[in-house]
Design a protein with these regions (language model features):
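Short conserved segment of the HATPase_c
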Residues: 176-188
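Detector for a conserved hydrophobic position within an alpha-helical segment of the HATPase_c
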Residues: 206-207
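Short beta-strand/loop element within the Bergerat-fold HATPase_c
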Residues: 151-163
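A conserved beta-strand-to-alpha-helix junction within the catalytic ATP-binding
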Residues: 89-101
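Conserved HAMP-HisKA connector
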Residues: 2-25
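Conserved catalytic submotifs in the C-terminal HATPase_c
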Residues: 98, 109, 114-124
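Histidine phosphotransfer helical core of two-component systems
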Residues: 30-68, 88
Length: 251
């Protein structure tokens, strides 16, 4: 079984390498197109009263928008295809959640979203690649923001779970139908205009790389709940209260 798993890992690594190389090759001509569109936009802006220039400028702006969309897609794809070698460190989950919420708070305020947090005080430490996990959590928060275009509430809750810890994100947004739920974590699936469909797929990939799981419950018109569960290695349990790794045993 281990040989089969290693072959699968090797095959995935090679596919990811080729995909990344292809994406980088696309980026180079895309950068040239974007630069020339900027130069054309400057030229056509010289005479705003000229109807021919105005029409040309509008067309240039459309091309610029599509170039930006392709750039976003490439960036998201490179992040999704990346072979992740996690730098796992003992981490206080509540501290990490607070940091990401602090970064997200201005966006929530702009969207009239109230964040309510219930962070359990007695959580054991978990092993996280903090940068990767922050990216996954931010993807979920942005997804909740997009689900509440008219504002709402977002509850962020941590708690103990069987053999680990749980992180819940509960929004009062538009919710999802059964079809959307069944395809939610598929790469390139998106219900948003201009969306790449890679944010949630990448988030799940990161959570699963940590040995965790991500689940979702949703009701159309009522809201959505994402739940991340993460394992707690036995050697970290002894340091759960103080947030320290257990020291060496005394003779």
């Amino acid at each position: 079984v281990s040989d089969v798993n290693q072959r699968l890992v090797d095959q995935y690594t090679e596919i990811a390498r080729l995909a990344g190389a292809l994406a980088h090759e696309i980026k180079n001509p895309l950068s040239t197109i974007r630069l020339n569109m900027e130069l054309l936009a400057e030229d056509f802006s010289q005479d705003p009263e000229n109807p021919l220039y105005r029409r040309a400028l509008n067309k240039v702006k459309v091309v610029q928008q599509e170039c930006q969309r392709l750039q976003d897609l490439l960036d998201d794809f490179l992040n999704f295809a990346k072979v992740r070698r996690l730098n796992l460190e003992p981490t206080n989950l509540n501290h990490q959640v607070r940091q990401v919420l602090g970064f997200f708070q201005p966006k929530a305020k702009e969207s009239n979203i109230e964040i309510i947090d219930y962070l359990a005080s007695d959580l054991p430490m978990v092993l996280l690649d903090r940068k990767a996990f922050d990216g996954a959590l931010l993807n979920l928060l942005l997804n909740a923001q997009q689900a509440m275009p008219n504002g709402g509430q977002l509850v962020v809750r941590t708690s103990g779970a069987r053999d680990g810890v749980a992180l819940d994100l509960i929004d009062t947004g538009c919710g999802m139908d059964a079809h959307t739920l069944s395809h939610l974590f598929e790469a390139f699936f998106s219900t948003k205009r201009g969306g790449t469909g890679l944010g949630l797929a990448t988030a799940r990939k990161i959570v699963e790389a940590h040995g965790g799981q991500i689940r979702v419950q949703s009701e159309l018109g009522r809201g959505t709940q994402f739940t991340i569960t993460l394992p707690v290695p036995a050697q970290l349990t002894a340091g759960a209260v103080t947030g320290q790794l257990p020291g060496p045993s005394q003779p």
